């Protein structure tokens, strides 16, 4: 390192001499000045010859002339390292002006003939170097003492009240000033301040006592470490370390034999939490994951519960209540008036344009309101026929006695519209708290994440993080490989769905409790104004809910079924049934199920085995209502063209709406009905007569069984179950009931029961009756499936013959059962004769080329 050369002088601080023992200084008593400089100044002088900007911010060196003193101002005890880093990119001019004003505020008034010649702001260190020029009549010590007095007075005024003193105790922002004793190095490197400074020497090092005397004035010192070539001082605050570095670095001691250079040293702190985690992974990671899960529950579950309540009460209802707020009215009413004025102006302009151009916008208005009108037509037509049933549904809800209602009806019969639109939404009290669950959205979910997302959407469960499911499984797998045990973080989809419904139960309970608390508060307010003998008795929660059924939310579970479309989602329906039964048993909600699958009632029976369900059965609309509905929708007055079209459609809302859409698209009524019948026929042949597999265990019918039912229903509207089980392809067994239930599920047939026992079989959709006739009237299709049907009958008789012959062989060995032999011989003859007849019919069908002929077989089927 280059040796020091004396280039200029500065006065020694007498206070420093008093703090140090005399033997530490090799200075003569006659010597009034100490001299210090470095080769850096030579380098600066050489580099400044051709430069125009030689300021300290550019060169890092502060020049000082005679009668000038350099002080360091510290403004705050800041530990905000982010702020320190960002300060490097802030505009220095703006910050410098602010700092200069602050220096003047705390330092003024200056002694006479004194002034500030330069302010160098250090934003990273929350301080500044300030160079003063003082009067020759003053000494540097006297001038510095005046400055310190002004700053002390400013700090006293700043913290004069108790509030500011409390802030200052926590966050010291008082201004402090120190004399710069060394040669400061002005740098803006990414060396951020720390409590620890490193001291290197040029020359003889200092002892621990000398370092303490030198640095103690800047703040409390926690520790001092002295080494051969370097020493370290650990201050109690970062502010003290900053002041010490800027004031002492470059200082010469011992007659120029020792020069001090100071830099910040990052303090390496031990993080005991991280050390514990890294040392005890098997214990720490499960604890951390458990804490994170608990934290997530505490944060997100109240939010999700609020969103579920919002879903039940509906946003429109909440907005209506919010509009009653007086502050909202102050803002909303002027806005509404302005909006109406603007809208009226546009209407006037549009009217004038229409008068000039001759264009009328009446048709456009009609088109805009078309959807609303169609809903009104639907309500007017079908409401009359279902009015009494809607009254019954409302009555059951208002009775508030185990409100567990089942609305049954074929697919497309308008069960959802009947319950939600015509019954609940039409009542001002009941519509306030309604939650509609679409079960088919859940049963059709193909993946675990889509199932969770669909369930959350139906319940209003928000926020939901489906991606965490995959991450938790990945973490669980990693922890199992790392620690040898599972974290338990990942959950099955059954558990996750169950937790979502459990939270929905809490939200529903909160709604009922909220209404009860409002009631209780109102009664208590009234009782404060009444005498003791006039006070109103506060009802218990159960009594309140019994008298106020509208306080309990109405849960509508739509399209409830026996099995899900996706086999892995079959747990959904039993889970929903158990959840609904819990709501009823806890008396916190009304539950209404809508279903077209009678087999789904088994889930409800399992969930509430001792409960008697209230049932409402919906059927198709009458022909007259269907005809009027179509005429109103199509704006037709001449109904003669519709007479032949309505009969195949019956009163099924789904088919009526499809027919109306076809007519509006430009099809002729007869053409439209023919296309619908052909599509239905294609659906039947594709899915029922070709052994189409809906799922692994759902296609339990034989195409010949479907063909037989089609032929019977094409001739008459109803089949007696007792007559059906006498036919060869059917028998009184569980298999027959399962087959018919499956066909009912897919809407091919409709089953009627009397006192819970199957009695009648009808066509599932009225349109299917015409489709049956369409299929049977096609000679090619009739020959195909009729032959297949007869071959199945032949197979049945062959099986019987084999059975009889085997039994005869066994009996002949005994040789003592002549009566049984005669019986079996007659049965063999009958089966043999049937086979002959069936084969003859098969030959006749193969040779037949005309229309399907009416045959009267000995079975009495045709």
Curated annotation (Swiss-Prot):
Protein name from the UniProt record: Mitochondrial escape protein 2
PANTHER family found in the cross-reference section: MITOCHONDRIAL ESCAPE PROTEIN 2 (PTHR32198:SF2)
Source organism of the structure: Lodderomyces elongisporus (strain ATCC 11503 / CBS 2605 / JCM 1781 / NBRC 1676 / NRRL YB-4239) (Yeast)
A molecular function GO annotation: RNA binding
Mitochondrial matrix side: 37-282
Residues passing through the membrane, by range: 283-303
Topology relative to the membrane: Single-pass membrane protein
Residue numbers on the Mitochondrial intermembrane membrane side: 304-862
GO biological process: mitochondrial genome maintenance; mRNA processing
Main location: mitochondrion
Function: Plays a role in maintaining the mitochondrial genome and in controlling the mtDNA escape. Involved in the regulation of mtDNA nucleotide structure and number. May have a dispensable role in early maturation of pre-rRNA.
Pfam families: RNA12 (PF10443)
Swiss-Prot/TrEMBL keywords: Coiled coil, Membrane, Mitochondrion, Mitochondrion inner membrane, mRNA processing, RNA-binding, Transit peptide, Transmembrane, Transmembrane helix
InterPro entries: Mt_escape_2_C (IPR018850), Nucleotide-bd_a/b_plait_sf (IPR012677), RBD_domain_sf (IPR035979), Yme2_C (IPR039627), Yme2_RRM (IPR034260)
Family matches, as SUPFAM superfamilies: RNA-binding domain, RBD
Transit peptide stretch: 1-36
Coiled-coil residues: 820-847
Domain RRM: 176-267
